[in-house]
Amino acid sequence: MAGVPISSFLANYYLKDMDRYFENNNIKYFRYADDILVFSNNIEELIEYKNDIHKYLIDSGLNINPDKEYIFNPKESVEFLGFEINGRIVDISKMQLKKIKGKIKRSARKFRRWKLKKNVEDIPTLVTMNKKFNNKFYGKEDDELSWRYYFFPLINTTDSLHEIDLYMQECQRYVVTGVHNKKNYEKVPYDFLKKCKYKSLVHEYYEFIQKNVK
């Protein structure tokens, strides 16, 4: 079902009775489309819930991908919908972190080639790159697909955001110089990146929290 444009609608249609079952029995159960998370006080109870889900899906002509089924205890971290939950700490998942760093790296190479091929100046090159990622990270007001409205309200640490910030700065310096080394900090200072519309995720996160904490 995942990957289909109407997958969320289909999941809601087929799983609404299962949602009602868990809700009526006061079981800690969360679902987004066909991603399901269930909490329990002990392993026996959890296995019982898992079997209930399996039975319901089989009776409905559906199935579970065994490669995406995990049982974990509260001391372990779990990744769910792009988040990593580790005790009371909620951060961006390692998989999501790897994906966004990959996109940044590919974009940096692309903009470096574009800059050289078209003989584009440093500032407009970085402005264009930042426009792309600022739209992804911050979007427009109430853009639910942007990181600002998807991740910011739920994470409670800036560890991953800080890592992305540093990686983004490194890649943008590479776009200008064509190399990765410590001298880039002098050749392309932070103020220059800001002049090119670069926005720090950590800074934007704290601004978002200050504006939205009641």
Model feature map: region roles:
Residues 1-33, 37-214:
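Non-catalytic terminal/accessory segments
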